[in-house]
From Swiss-Prot:
CC cofactor: [4Fe-4S] cluster
rRNA processing in keyword set: yes
Name of the protein: Dual-specificity RNA methyltransferase RlmN
UniProt catalytic activity: adenosine(2503) in 23S rRNA + 2 reduced [2Fe-2S]-[ferredoxin] + 2 S-adenosyl-L-methionine = 2-methyladenosine(2503) in 23S rRNA + 5'-deoxyadenosine + L-methionine + 2 oxidized [2Fe-2S]-[ferredoxin] + S-adenosyl-L-homocysteine; adenosine(37) in tRNA + 2 reduced [2Fe-2S]-[ferredoxin] + 2 S-adenosyl-L-methionine = 2-methyladenosine(37) in tRNA + 5'-deoxyadenosine + L-methionine + 2 oxidized [2Fe-2S]-[ferredoxin] + S-adenosyl-L-homocysteine
Domain annotation Radical SAM core: ranges: 130-379
Keywords, alphabetical: 4Fe-4S, Cytoplasm, Disulfide bond, Iron, Iron-sulfur, Metal-binding, Methyltransferase, rRNA processing, S-adenosyl-L-methionine, Transferase, tRNA processing
Function in brief: Specifically methylates position 2 of adenine 2503 in 23S rRNA and position 2 of adenine 37 in tRNAs. m2A2503 modification seems to play a crucial role in the proofreading step occurring at the peptidyl transferase center and thus would serve to optimize ribosomal fidelity.
Annotated disulfide bonds: 137-382
Subcellular location(s) of the protein: Cytoplasm
General remark: Reaction proceeds by a ping-pong mechanism involving intermediate methylation of a conserved cysteine residue.
Naturally occurring in which organism (per UniProt): Rhizobium meliloti (strain 1021) (Ensifer meliloti)
Transmembrane segments: none
Family named by the database record: Belongs to the radical SAM superfamily. RlmN family.
Residues that bind [4Fe-4S] cluster: 144, 148, 151
Amino acid sequence: MAATEILNRADIVKAPQVRLAPQPEKPSLIGLLRDDIAKLLAEKGVPERQVKMRVSQLWHWLYVRGVSDFDEMSNVSKDMREMLKEHFTIARPDIVEEQVSGDGTRKWLLRFPPRGAGRPVEIETVYIPEEGRGTLCISSQVGCTLTCSFCHTGTQKLVRNLTAEEILSQLLLARDRLGDFPERDTPQGAIVPAEGRKITNIVMMGMGEPLYNFENVKTALLIASDGDGLSLSKRRITLSTSGIVPEIYRTGEEIGVMLAISLHAVRDDLRDMLVPINKKYPLKQLMEACRAYPGLSNARRITFEYVMLKDVNDSLEDAKELVKLLKGIPAKINLIPFNPWPGTNYQCSDWEQIEKFADFINQAGYASPIRTPRGRDILAACGQLKSESERMRKVDRLAFEAMMIANHGED
């Protein structure tokens, strides 16, 4: 088989035998802060003098060792393990499908159990291996309310917010599948960084608007960055928003991770059409929130995402206005060649025009990387994620190029 055929082939891995997702009446300990775990243990009769120690044990097993079965907690007494099994769960979501691109990009379709009177829901999580690092793209909602006109996810109505458990479980499951916990083996065929952690960066850039699910996203990211557990540096966590201005201020004050803005236009009239939330929070308000974001410097910049749409927002005049708009903000501008999907009215800018746009911005003093094509054979690209119930047939999706999220977060 020719090398090009191998690189353009998507390997679909059937769902492995995994522990079934939890029943809704059994609360999960995943996604709970220490104080919340302590309260639950006390309610179940754990003596007050033992609660703090038990919480520390559980935290270590959940987030350092990555176990998904209470019986694996070898330094926890048998009676305690039986109580935990009876009342709680730490199971992972079901893997419906795992797809592996020829370039090593992995996409998981995950199913979470019903919540209340709801139905099971499915979301997608994507892993992008690169030399020296690996980035996990995490979803925050099932569907999206923002209806950005160029985004495939935006054509799927919002079903519900993901819980902190469901957000964090995407990271835990990915680390499981990549052998990224102690004493876990890397799966055969996985393309991962040669040394150190397999997942070094996470980006909240999957399905949904993270800041419309602020509290759950906040809890999940605080746990992910906790130094006694998963221990991801906040400089390696990037939250992307379309511009929910009040929560941008809260993100800086309460979470403190890196910020990315889905900008895509430099004029309010055009951004109103491309990113309708702009009608509520126009560019002036958005830029004020960005300038006020805590800790900005040349080493800690805001990433501005700009999808390149042919004859829509890709002129040199647009580039000039972009430089003017961002004046005074430590920034990096990620240029995203548009990822086509069935039914879209947009086209990707010509490559020559993208390079001219990038050169102008670069000469003005801004880093302006063009996203590297990744996962093009598995529809894993920015703006293309959708749950399986909304998915096109494989023969259709293989007709469309996709470009995987890359170059996000700080090294």
